[in-house]
Amino acid sequence: MCEFKIQELALLNYRRFENEKFTLNPRMNVFAGKNGSGKTTVLEAANVMLGAYLAAYKTYVPSRFVYNIKSADVRQKAQISEDSTIFTTGTISQYPCKISCIAKWGEQDKTIEFQRVILKEDARTKFGGSNPMQPTVIAWEEAISKADHSDIEVVLPLVLYLSTARLWKDGNKKATKRG
């Protein structure tokens, strides 16, 4: 069975982090902190890296399911002038915005490194290099498309991601009128 375990995440200019590295335990990780300290940001960065896995599928995973870095995810730096007579406002987006990953991938626990990056405003998320998962995923897709049971050994990973944003959606509330 092919395993995918993220060992290390490195964030460069991603949301509130200028340059931060997180080493993850293969069994379980707990992020605890005050509101706004970056707990969700680390999980969203892991989701961007899972997007690299999903992006490797060309046939069976629509691109709308691939989570990318957005322009709004780029760290903002306040403009500050050395001259006290000059008033500055606003922020400047800090590019490049990059998420790097070291992970175990495959049946032989091979270590892979890859990164996803956005280089300028309104640009698309790119791979910094090639996607090391793509050859394996292409082989899986070919086996599945044959429909001759040659895919019997393929065990696809289950990927589940629930964002905290789901807590704030009002779409499922039904208005009831009494009286």
Set out the residue ranges of the language-model regions:
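P-loop NTPase switch/coupling surface
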Residues: 1-179
